[in-house]
UniProtKB/Swiss-Prot annotation:
Stated name of the protein: Guanine nucleotide exchange factor LTE1
Domain Ras-GEF residues, every copy: 1121-1361
Keywords: Cell cycle, Cell division, Cytoplasm, Guanine-nucleotide releasing factor, Mitosis
InterPro entries (alphabetical): Ras-like_GEF (IPR008937), Ras-like_Gua-exchang_fac_N (IPR000651), Ras_G-nucl-exch_fac_CS (IPR019804), Ras_GEF_dom_sf (IPR023578), RASGEF_cat_dom (IPR001895), RASGEF_cat_dom_sf (IPR036964)
Record's function text: GDP-GTP exchange factor component of the mitotic exit network (MEN). Fine-tunes the timing of the mitotic exit and couples this event with cytokinesis. May also be involved in proprotein-processing in the secretory pathway.
Gene Ontology cellular component list: cellular bud; cytoplasm; plasma membrane
Primary location recorded for the protein, binned into one broad class: cytoplasm
Signal peptide: none
Location in the cell: Cytoplasm; Bud
UniProt record similarity statement: Belongs to the LTE1 family.
Source organism of this protein record: Kluyveromyces lactis (strain ATCC 8585 / CBS 2359 / DSM 70799 / NBRC 1267 / NRRL Y-1140 / WM37)
Biased composition (Basic and acidic residues): 298-314, 661-670
One Pfam entry name: RasGEF
Length: 1366
């Protein structure tokens, strides 16, 4: 049986020896068409096609070879091609060796040479595309060349050449590879022939051999050849070897008739049908319309929707939103300088100059950055003509002021640049031109929508930061995307790199939300520790090591419940702990010296010596001459004599640097028994009140018991508090020091019992009673130590007050004392100020305190006050100074604005949630560990350099604290409570009085309380010249960097948008083996969908940006000449179409249906899912909708006429620039039904412009398959630059792709279909490469406006078109 099989195999004729393939293909397997001296293959089999490419009789046709390797992937796999090549190669070798003396040997050698040329072309030009990404193909090829046995010199040279070419490509495409030739000791020809080349380890599969466990990284060249469309298109052109124009394929007469018939039959789904184009129809109407109805828009997505014009394997993008109005989801990403149209320029080819408005904010006249001190003419009334502009600026400014500045990376200059470059406001000077009075207040609503979208993210981030301290987390997110390739070219389509900005902010918001949710959902069942000493240690954040120089210090507990410290203040410095290297402290020794096992009887009538340490700050300045009252939550009942103190450097904001110095003496008058007694009692009472309320919110199960404890304690101390408030009041500055006071008193049983809490939760606990008795017994022992140090304490107290009384605080944060926060949850600002105004007015009755020169700094601006959500408590920036509370008598008591600013609406559990999360890592059952050994570990050790950097404030014009300001304003200025009217009015310029919803309600309340808010102030006339300077001041107040253009260094490719597109072009199946897994791109992929979901939550809520406010709208294009706009649009189209890869065109890789994008921001966040064609289509559609939106939203008929004329002139300039893509966008928009219905407006158009329009609108005619636009494209002058109209090419490709691929399934290939595709693609790529001849300067302001455009949704356009007059 086996013999029969062998005979049968011998009788089988090799594939390439069959008559129809040897020596050349016959007509039965390959049909050609000779046209103009070139050979076009119409149909063929795959073996016949390979035979034709390596024909021994015909000359080498490099054009055919190039076309084949461009399109073969559409009808066969690379593995199958390599199989055919190997089979033909081996067949030629066998043929040569079969009869060395015959003619067949010569033929076989020619075939081998032609096959070598074919393989060399493949390896040289498509190694990165085919072999780098396909491990199995590489192994198959290596098996082919390694399996060759030396025969003769001719064949050896072919194999050696292929091996050398392979090794050369491998060395170029992978990094971290040693010199393979040297490593394998390859020197001679024999070495090359014997060398079995190994594949490069990928790391993603189980490789064998040494060193194969670690995958190699691809080189920059490899990545560029894989995912950079610009480089790939240039490489394609380099293979053509022609200086001629590549023509579009010519169709026969029969084919043209068939295509014309198809065009008429498929009108409803064609890319172009301008006669019936209407972008104004709503989405619902389009869904219900018929396929051939006039609803068909000029948008490319209409053809994409047709399944006939799309590939079966095309992906469908997820809808951006399930809401019909996508425009409510997000808008443009650009931050314009203002939403203003600054100048009206006459139409460029205009026949008449109608009016020109002088710009108030041009690059050449940018005002210098000022602090607004020269603003004399202020506007704070309800000026309706400017409410839109000023209100929007105020709202956005407030967002940035609320944003914490501890992490400057989170507020990059690009955000300010977006507002600077994109916000378009009309000019405020009318001059002699007859314009409507309301024109001066108009702005581009579409541009403002773009800014509002980004500001939405900023406000969300600010709100989260106000609830959670996430400095380290957000810093990591900011650094996540800082690695940019500065060597690449400047990116035009995202010139402000807003994709990175938005991604960074969104990542921060996502991370903060996760952290906040984890902490909020975290439940705790800890019991309060019976050890009040442990609780006290927690409260002071390991203050004991600061007392290392005094071994006799001690502390006593006067209250069983002390509050949790607040660490959730995102804008305030945290208390610094300077750890003792010995991890020991005198306080610890004093406590450990007395064993708690020595329980004595509780002596309720014993004498007590109570000591207290308080941290002085801006909130602790309400005190009495005889009884010092501390209102600062940061006080802790620790007896201190002297300690290293923190010195604040003047004019350096928020801990730019600090040092330590010896403590100074203080006034002994502050150490009187009366002072000590009142201070201890009142401070402890207030501290207990605030903190216990916080614990109530955090632990709901214990609310009733703790509430009873607090109530009992408050009742016992109410008389003392009242007495303190009635004493003679004093005024003393914040000293930035620690102050110690003691109270020697003899407490009666009744008085002591009145102070003790009566909570069954605590007093009913046996362990608590035992330990409290132990503390009572130890009190007597510790009292002796206290007496021995009293003299030293008195001396140090004197030094404190004398030397530190004039130190100025340099912080500007507006915060609240937490005890005020919880004193009355229902208190209103009016109620508080009634009590405090009387206190303030008493200042004039007392001698003024000498004001140090260093303290004379401007008063804080009310508009810079942070929002309610960022109000701090104990650990605010103001509380960083450790200040003495001891002060001289006969000083007037003063109440700061911060204390008025006391209403905090966020829940108290937000304030304490961070401590709750960090509770008790050892999982004991107590809220605070009773272990006394933990005293040194109550606070983690801090890195001072990190803290210093963390709290540095970028602002250069910060004001001093209100304590210092009040000292500086003790003269006649105190008549207005220390408020500078001029400064206040300057800030009020940015407040929109008529739109209270855009204002911070706390700022509004403060202004009313201070008497500086007046709605009845006189209105400013619209034509007043002061209005111009007013708007300029608003721009300055927004703290925008005044740069006329981006620096030269910024012209590098900053766009993360481009980089992410490059990385996502690689096939997902091989990306992990090609890209470094630690790269920022890989880490960000996990959050891309979350970012999109976050942006989708944005809804348009500002009434000033809705279509109801159309009377305020004016297109920004009216502030620029049409030539400039055409130039910038050309730059944008050049880079957009450069993202279209030749392979995407050949495969027609585009989505069957695209969402309706209404802003460039939507495209930025979705770009990774879009092919180059999809990106170009989406941009085309967005631009058409934007043009229609600008015209429809313009209500004034003259302005609408000017807008239409301006677009006509821009289109004419685009035609001159050979920018046919933008030209067609404008023509299709102007020819839409929505725009054409404004008949009265068209009647006002200049006759010359109407003639120009008649010529332009004939360009997209369907006659003879778009013969007009094709003629324009064919007549292009290459050296002048060109932007081809991509829709023509997509139309041709769509029609061609409908042809059958196989005439006989899997046997006879319709190769003409693919040759036609290649010809179309090469024509497009060549014309796109001519765009490099453009020599256009970048105008960053105008470019930003043109890039980050926003359009109305179709429903909005439809709604306006029905309401607008004809």
């Amino acid at each position: 049986m086996s013999e029969v099989v062998e005979k049968a195999d011998e009788n089988v004729v090799p594939l390439f020896s069959r008559p129809e393939l040897y020596p050349v293909p016959s007509e039965s397997v390959l049909t050609v068409d000779l046209r103009d001296g070139t050979v076009r293959i119409l149909k063929c089999t795959l073996p016949a096609l390979l035979v034709q490419l390596s024909s021994p009789l015909d000359k080498v046709d490099y054009s055919m070879l190039t076309d084949f390797f461009l399109v073969y992937r559409n009808f066969m796999s690379s593995q199958k091609l390599l199989d055919l090549i190997q089979e033909r190669f081996q067949w030629a070798i066998d043929l040569r060796q079969s009869d060395p003396s015959s003619q067949e040997k010569i033929t076989s050698e020619v075939i081998l040479v032609r096959m070598f040329v074919l393989v060399r072309h493949w390896l040289s030009n498509y190694f990165a595309q085919d072999f780098v990404v396909d491990t199995s193909l590489r192994r198959q090829f290596l098996q082919f060349i390694n399996g060759y046995s030396p025969v003769d010199r001719f064949l050896d040279n072919i194999i050696i050449s292929l091996k050398k070419l392979w090794v050369q490509n491998v060395q170029i495409m992978w990094e971290d590879l040693e010199n393979l030739i040297v490593e394998n000791n390859v020197v001679s020809r024999d070495d090359w022939l014997k060398w079995e080349i190994e594949d490069v380890p990928s790391g993603s599969s189980s490789e064998t051999g040494e060193g194969s466990t670690k995958g190699k990284r691809l080189s920059f060249i490899a990545l560029q050849n894989i995912n950079n469309p610009v480089l790939r298109n240039e490489s394609l052109l380099s293979l053509l070897h022609t200086r001629e124009k590549i023509p579009l394929p010519q169709q026969s007469e029969d084919e043209s008739k068939k295509q014309s018939t198809r065009i008429k039959q498929r009108t409803g789904s064609m890319l172009l049908f301008p006669e019936n184009a209407s972008n104004g129809l709503s989405i619902n109407e389009k869904l219900t319309a018929s396929g051939v109805s006039p609803e068909a828009t000029p948008k490319q997505e209409r053809e994409i929707t047709d399944p006939k014009n799309s590939k079966d394997n095309k992906h469908i993008l997820p809808q951006l939103s399930r809401v019909t109005n996508v425009s409510y989801m997000m808008k443009d990403l650009e931050y314009p300088s203002t939403p203003s149209v600054d100048i009206f320029v006459p139409p460029t080819p205009a026949k008449n100059i109608e009016f020109i408005l002088q710009t108030s904010y041009m690059e050449t006249d940018l005002p210098e950055q000022s602090n607004g001190s020269d603003s004399t003419n202020t506007v704070n009334g309800n000026n309706t003509n400017h409410k839109g502009i000023l209100g929007l600026l105020s709202k956005w400014k407030l967002n940035h002021q609320r944003k914490p500045t501890v992490n400057p990376v989170q507020n990059p200059p690009r955000v300010e640049n977006l507002i600077k470059y994109v916000f378009s406001i009309s000019s405020l000077d009318n001059h002699a031109n007859p314009l409507p009075d309301s024109l001066s207040s108009m702005f581009d609503i579409l541009s403002a929508r773009t800014i509002d979208e980004v500001e939405y993210l900023v406000s969300v981030e600010s709100d989260l930061l106000a609830k959670l301290e996430a400095k380290k987390l957000t810093t990591e997110i900011s650094k996540l995307e800082t690695n940019e390739d500065e060597s690449q070219d400047y990116s035009v389509i995202d010139n402000l790199n807003l994709y990175k900005t938005v991604s960074s902010i969104a990542n921060s918001v996502i991370s903060l939300s996760k952290t906040l949710n984890v902490r909020t959902n975290k439940s705790t069942t800890h019991l309060l520790s019976p050890s009040t000493s442990a609780l006290e240690r927690k409260n002071i954040r390991n203050s004991a090591p600061m007392l290392y120089s005094y071994n006799n210090s001690r502390y006593s507990i006067t209250n069983a419940l002390m509050g949790l410290p607040n660490t959730n203040d995102n804008s305030s410095p945290k208390r610094l702990v300077f750890h003792d290297p010995t991890r020991n402290s005198p306080t610890k020794k004093a406590i450990l010296a007395n064993n708690l096992n020595n329980i004595g009887e509780y002596n309720g009538e014993r004498d007590s010596i109570t000591s207290i340490v308080t941290y002085d700050s801006a909130f602790s300045d309400i005190s009495s001459s005889g009884n010092i009252l501390s209102q600062h939550k940061g006080s802790s009942n620790i007896f201190m004599e002297s300690a290293p103190t923190l010195k604040r450097k003047l004019n350096v904001n928020d801990l730019r640097r600090f040092n330590f110095e010896k403590s100074d003496s203080t006034d002994d008058r502050s150490c009187s028994p009366q002072n000590r007694e009142a201070t201890e009692t009142s401070a402890t009472s207030m501290e207990s009140d605030a903190n216990d309320n916080a614990i109530q919110d955090e632990y709901e199960n214990e609310n009733e018991d703790i509430a009873s404890l607090i109530t009992a304690y408050e009742e016992s101390t109410s008389e003392i508090d009242t007495q303190c408030q009635n004493n003679a009041q004093i005024r003393r500055p914040t000293s930035g020091r620690i102050s110690i006071t003691r109270n020697y008193s003899v407490a009666s049983p009744n008085s002591l019992r009145s102070i003790l809490p009566k909570s069954p939760l605590i007093l009913g606990n046996e362990v608590f009673i035992e330990r409290d008795k132990a503390l009572a017994a130890n009190q007597d022992i510790i009292s002796e130590l206290e007496e021995t140090t009293s003299l030293l304490l008195n001396d140090n107290d004197r030094k404190f007050t004398v030397s530190r009384g004039s130190v100025c605080n340099d912080s500007d944060s507006q915060s609240i004392s937490t005890n005020l926060l919880f004193s009355s949850a229902q208190a209103s600002p009016q109620k508080l100020v009634i009590k405090e105004v009387d206190v303030i007015q008493e200042k004039s009755e007392h001698p003024d305190v000498p004001t140090p020169v260093l303290c004379k700094q401007p008063i804080s601006k009310l508009s810079e006050t942070p929002s309610i959500k960022s109000i701090g408590s104990r650990d605010s920036e103001e509380s960083f100074d450790l200040t003495s509370i001891a002060s001289k008598p006969n000083r007037a008591q003063s109440t700061t604005l911060r204390e008025k600013y006391h209403l905090e609406k966020q829940a108290t559990n937000d304030i304490f949630e961070e401590d709750v999360e960090n509770l008790n890592p050892e999982n004991n059952k107590y809220l605070f560990s009773p272990d006394t050994d933990s005293i040194d570990f109550a606070s983690p050790e801090k890195n001072l350099d990190d803290l210093k950097q963390q709290f540095i404030d970028q602002s250069t014009d910060e004001q001093t604290s209100l304590d210092e300001e009040e000292i500086a304003t003790q003269d006649n200025e105190n008549k207005d409570h220390g408020i500078d009217k001029k400064k206040l009015e300057d800030i009020m310029n940015g407040i929109d009085d008529t739109a209270d919803t855009s204002m911070d309600p706390v700022n509004l309340a403060l202004m009313k309380l201070e008497g500086t808010y007046d709605k009845g102030e006189k209105e400013i006339d619209d034509k007043s010249p002061s209005i111009n300077s007013e708007l300029a001041r608003e721009v300055e107040n927004f703290q925008i960097v005044q740069t006329a253009a981006l620096p030269e260094s910024a012209r590098k490719r900053q766009s993360m948008f481009i980089q992410r597109r490059r990385n996502t072009m690689i096939d997902f199946s091989v990306r992990d083996s090609l890209i470094d897994k630690d790269s920022s791109c890989t880490r960000l992929e996990n959050t891309d969908e979350q970012i999109r979901n976050l942006l989708n939550q944005y809804t348009l809520t500002d009434s000033r940006l809705k279509i109801d406010n159309l009377e305020q709208h004016i297109p920004f294009i009216l502030m620029y000449d049409s030539k400039s706009v055409a130039n910038q649009l050309t730059l944008i189209e050049k880079e957009i179409l450069s993202e279209v890869d030749w392979k995407d065109l050949l495969d027609l890789t585009m989505s069957e249906q695209l969402p309706q994008f209404t802003s460039w921001l939507q495209l930025l966040v979705q770009n990774e899912n879009l092919s180059g064609i999809d990106l170009a289509i989406a941009r085309f559609n967005l631009t058409v909708d934007w043009i229609i939106s600008e015209i429809v939203m313009t209500q004034d008929i003259r302005l609408r006429r000017n807008t239409i004329q301006r677009f006509i002139h821009i289109a004419e300039h685009c035609k001159e620039l050979q920018n046919y893509n933008t030209l067609m966008e404008i023509i299709l928009a102007l020819n839409s039904i929505v725009v054409q219905k404004f008949t009265e407006t068209w009647r006002l158009v200049e006759p010359g412009d109407l003639l120009t329009w008649e010529t332009l609108k004939a360009i997209p005619s369907l006659e003879k398959n778009y013969s007009n636009i094709r003629q324009l494209i064919d007549e292009v002058e290459p050296l002048s630059g060109c932007i081809p109209f991509i829709v023509v090419y997509l139309s041709d490709l769509s029609l061609n792709i409908e042809k059958r691929t196989w005439i006989v399934h899997d046997e006879v290939l319709n190769y003409n279909k693919f040759q036609t595709n290649v010809q179309i693609v090469k024509n497009f790529v060549q014309k796109m490469q001519w765009s490099k001849f453009y020599n256009i300067d970048i105008d960053h302001e105008l470019l930003s406006k043109c890039v980050y455009i926003t359009s109305l949704s179709h429903d909005e356009i439809n709604s306006i078109s029905h309401k607008s007059p004809i």
